[in-house]
Every structure is written in structure tokens, then in C-alpha cells.
């Protein structure tokens, strides 16, 4: 069964229910149940109701607040014996799926386009961040190599000065030893 046939079947069920004496309150409750269960029929009926009432904001706020839509001031309870009004709604409902599916396709395409653009921006930012990180890594490696060279240079200087100090200490200790020997011999 195609989507359009399913839609026609559901709208016919509502038409039959309204002929059997379903009042506005029951229809309103049924509509609220369809909308709250996120059914396709409920969303289409809501769209149709919003378009036909002209007071979409008030109607949406009533539905969101859980108020009974039948109490909506600008909606009128259909009079008994007026089947023509309900069949007119059914005809409009059958036309609605085509426009809604086109709108849904446009929305999906727009969403897909935005997601593609966002993904592209993300990939560009990721590449840029990787490039920046590689540059930072290269700079840090250069600094590390310079610091290692400096450490090596300082170690060599340290060894040189240690050797100098040892030489000076050795000369001083020999001199001191010779002074002690002379004093001891002179006695």
C-alpha cells in the first residue's frame, strides 16, 4: 500500500467517524492523541488545521500546553448533517501529502547541505589544527635540540673548569707539602 493510499484510508476513517456523530471534543482529543504520538496523520492534520485556522501560534500553544483544542474560540463545532465540510477537509488532506513531502525533501536537502558544509568546515579546521600542531612540534624539537647543544657546551665548560681547579689544587697542595717539609728540615 502506498503512502498516499494509507493517507486516503486514514482520512476516510476520520470522515466516517465524523459522520457517525463524533463531536469536536472527541475529534480534538483524537487529533491530540495523533499529534502526541508523532503519527504522520497527526502531523498532517495539525498542518492542515494550522493553515485553515489562521491562528497557528495560539493553536500550537494550546496543543503544547495540553489544552483542549475544541475550546479554541475561532474554531466552530460542525453542525450535524453537514457532511460536505468534512469531505472538503478530506480532499484538502489528500493534497497536503504532496506539498508536505516536497517540503520535507527540501528540508532534508537543506539539512544535508548544512551538514556537508559543517563537515567540510570541521575537516578544514582539523587540517589547520594538525598543521599548527606540526609547526609547534617542529619548533619545540628545534628548541630541544638547541637546549641539548647548550647543555653539552656547558658540560664541556664544567669539565674544563673542574680540570683547572684540580690542577690549581694539586699545585697548592704540592706547595703546601714543600713548605711543611722545609719547616720540618729547618728544625
Curated annotation (Swiss-Prot):
It is found in: Cytoplasm; Nucleus. Residues 105-168 form the bZIP domain. Induction: Expression requires MET4, and is repressed by an increase of intracellular S-adenosylmethionine (AdoMet). GO terms for biological process: cysteine biosynthetic process; methionine biosynthetic process; positive regulation of transcription by RNA polymerase II; regulation of sulfur amino acid metabolic process; regulation of sulfur metabolic process; regulation of transcription by RNA polymerase II. Its main location: cytoplasm. GO terms for cellular component: Cbf1-Met4-Met28 complex; cytoplasm; nucleus; transcription regulator complex. Residues 137-151 are annotated as: Leucine-zipper. Interacts with MET4 to form a heteromeric complex which also includes CBF1. Forms two alternate complexes associating MET28 with MET4 and either MET31 or MET32. Binds to DNA through the MET4-MET28-CBF1 complex. PANTHER family: ACTIVATING TRANSCRIPTION FACTOR ATF 4/5 (PTHR13044), TRANSCRIPTIONAL ACTIVATOR OF SULFUR METABOLISM MET28 (PTHR13044:SF45). This is Transcriptional activator of sulfur metabolism MET28. It comes from Saccharomyces cerevisiae (strain ATCC 204508 / S288c) (Baker's yeast). The gene is MET28.
Amino acid at each position: 500500500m502506498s503512502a498516499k493510499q494509507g493517507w486516503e484510508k486514514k482520512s476516510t476513517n476520520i470522515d466516517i467517524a465524523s459522520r457517525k456523530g463524533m463531536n469536536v471534543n472527541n475529534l480534538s482529543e483524537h487529533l491530540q492523541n495523533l499529534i502526541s504520538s508523532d503519527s504522520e496523520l497527526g502531523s498532517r492534520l495539525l498542518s492542515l488545521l494550522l493553515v485553515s485556522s489562521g491562528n497557528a501560534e495560539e493553536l500550537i500553544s494550546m496543543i503544547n500546553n495540553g489544552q483542549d483544542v475544541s475550546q479554541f474560540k475561532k474554531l466552530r463545532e460542525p453542525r450535524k448533517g453537514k457532511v460536505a465540510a468534512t469531505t472538503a477537509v478530506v480532499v484538502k488532506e489528500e493534497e497536503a501529502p504532496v506539498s508536505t513531502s516536497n517540503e520535507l525533501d527540501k528540508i532534508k536537502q537543506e539539512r544535508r547541505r548544512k551538514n556537508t558544509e559543517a563537515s567540510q568546515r570541521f575537516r578544514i579546521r582539523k587540517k589547520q589544527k594538525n598543521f599548527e600542531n606540526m609547526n609547534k612540534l617542529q619548533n619545540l624539537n628545534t628548541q630541544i635540540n638547541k637546549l641539548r647543544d647548550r647543555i653539552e657546551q656547558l658540560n664541556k665548560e664544567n669539565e674544563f673548569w673542574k680540570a683547572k681547579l684540580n690542577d690549581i689544587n694539586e699545585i697548592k697542595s704540592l706547595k703546601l707539602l714543600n713548605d711543611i717539609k722545609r719547616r720540618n728540615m729547618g728544625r
